[in-house]
Amino acid sequence: MESFSALAPDPLYPEKESERHANKLEAWGTAVLRWLSRKRRQPLWRTRRILKQVHAEAALLAGLDLAGVRARADEVAFELRCDGITQASAARAFALVRQAGKLALGKAHFDVQLLGGWAMLQGMVAEMNTGEGKTLTATLPAATAALAGLPVHVITTNDYLVERDAQIMSPLYEALGLTVRWVSMDMEPAQRRLAYQADIVYCSNKTLVFDYLRDLIVLDDDKDEDRLRLERLRGGSGRLSELFLRGLCFAIVDEADSVLVDEARTPLIISGSQKEDGGAVTGQALALAQAMQAGHYRVQPAARRVVLTEAGRAYLREACAAWPAPWSIPFRREELILSALTVLHLYKRDEQYIVRDGKVMVVDEFTGRVMPDRSWGQGVHQMIEHKEGLELSDPRVTLKSISYQRFFKHYLRLAGMTGTAAEIRGELGRVYNLPVVRIPTHRPSRRLHAPDSVYRTMAEKWSAVRERCRELHGRGVPVLIGTRSVAASEELARVLADAALPVVLLNAKQDADEASLIARAGEVGSIMIATNMAGRGTDIPLSAAARQAGGLHVILTERHESARIDRQLEGRSGRQGDPGHTEAILSLEDAVLDSVKNSLWAGPMNTLLAAQGPGWRGLAAHWLRHAQARTERKLARERRAMVSADEELENSLSFSGQGD
């Protein structure tokens, strides 16, 4: 394999320089070289060769206790730092990490985990089924790189998983003499700076990127090494003391498809407050938007946008003819009204946001979790506050922004792991130069999938879910029900409570005791309703009686924007050879069908489904999957457009002498 020796962090803030292309031909040439480099990386059958080496090294370590592991770690670290990471030295490191896991955690890595770790150490995405122990797998490349002297970031989707994984794995790292800490968004800046000094840092993607943007603000886009070294020699409170990160050396991205693809549709923006008395304008915009009629605009739910018609523009010109600025400025007037219409029609309470303690809090659509320090721009956040009758916060002004695509390409080495990467293999390779390797399961899956059930209305769907839960609860089967929004989870909870069924709710508003709730979700007869919070990284342990009753039964109540998210929820069941069942109970009123309302097939399909002839439910299930696939294609186009815009911006900045 390519040695890591060239990646040693000699610079004060090591990271990969951005690729800048003078023209499309140069960009095409770079893409071809990337493709060839991915093809040169080892396929799985060749990757298996390391297993023999690891087992041979492990036999030599079998008698070591924790003190012996610690002493051997110093020897391995010296070799790695002198010679770089080669296949032979990596095998020795893996065997040592495996022995540390056995002694400190009571867990020795399986062969499939060794394969996954080796793939990631080479800069690949390891596709491992849910329940195969990705958290333990990540310790192999993380510890090996850290022993080699590289700062390591283990990145996952939320603070709950960050803290959980770091705490569980810390005894293993400490046995090797490595420091490990985690970073969460609610930590004070001084705490985060200290945490980033550790050998291995667990953090969420959002917290990490925002801290990187804060570093860019401190550096003011000036990363001149000589100047930074001079500042360090002078001592005192220079820029280096204000930085959070130690550069971008090696990242292991858990749930890589979610972080690198699903969440990569919009740039991350760090902003500052801007004192402005905009309450009057905000109220006027909402009042004017409410007065507009349907013919003045078109709502496009699938694209999450509103467009003005010519009739709408004419209405605004006439309504605002005598109004002062900003209403007298056409582009600003339309911008305000489009924001107001978007707030009225596309931002719904308990879906996109919740209200807590008199404040609007954004709900992450991918994780289902509250993001208390985040806000929407372009006046949208203030309009939502006005709509909810709350005190208006100060508008925000952009200080720095970056896309996930551009950020992660700055790492000297990038790797990832997920249970659902096959569908986006091409995108991961094209955008991040990340090959995907499929890792086999440790035990055969025993999960059973029932055919989809489709009902005409939402009410009929909830009724069917209620009856299914009643039947499963009577048999002692634990049930996990997935919903797409807080509102849907609360509505279903009321339906089940009215039927005297015991229900536990886990969503952005009910997240105080998440760990204990999840720990009880695998008990006999339990019923948990959850948003995406229980969809990724969540291990629901089964009691012996629940396993005997048939294992966890997962019910999907809506198709998500991506089939991968559905598969993640299904993956909570049947883990590590446990029994389990999954099924989808859906309706023709589900939000996913918004994407096909205006398609050529919408009319004929609606007619066929309304007739409810023989086989209509199977046809409806196919129509729902088609709508989901259509949404996936639309989102992929949006991401491609964003990458293109990013590249154009990068190239234009290179000619103007700017850029990160």
Swiss-Prot record:
Documented EC number(s): 7.4.2.8
SMART domains: SecA_DEAD, SecA_PP_bind
Annotated catalysed reactions: ATP + H2O + cellular proteinSide 1 = ADP + phosphate + cellular proteinSide 2
Entries under CDD domains matching the protein: DEXDc_SecA (cd17928), SF2_C_secA (cd18803)
Compartments, as annotated in UniProt: Cell inner membrane; Cytoplasm
Cellular component GO terms held in the UniProt record: cell envelope Sec protein transport complex; cytosol; plasma membrane
Domain of life: Bacteria
Residues annotated as binding ATP: 113, 131-135, 539
Family annotation (HAMAP family): SecA (MF_01382)
The protein's role, per its UniProt record: Part of the Sec protein translocase complex. Interacts with the SecYEG preprotein conducting channel. Has a central role in coupling the hydrolysis of ATP to the transfer of proteins into and across the cell membrane, serving both as a receptor for the preprotein-SecB complex and as an ATP-driven molecular motor driving the stepwise translocation of polypeptide chains across the membrane.
Protein name: Protein translocase subunit SecA 2
Lineage: Bacteria, Pseudomonadati, Pseudomonadota, Betaproteobacteria, Burkholderiales
Gene: secA2
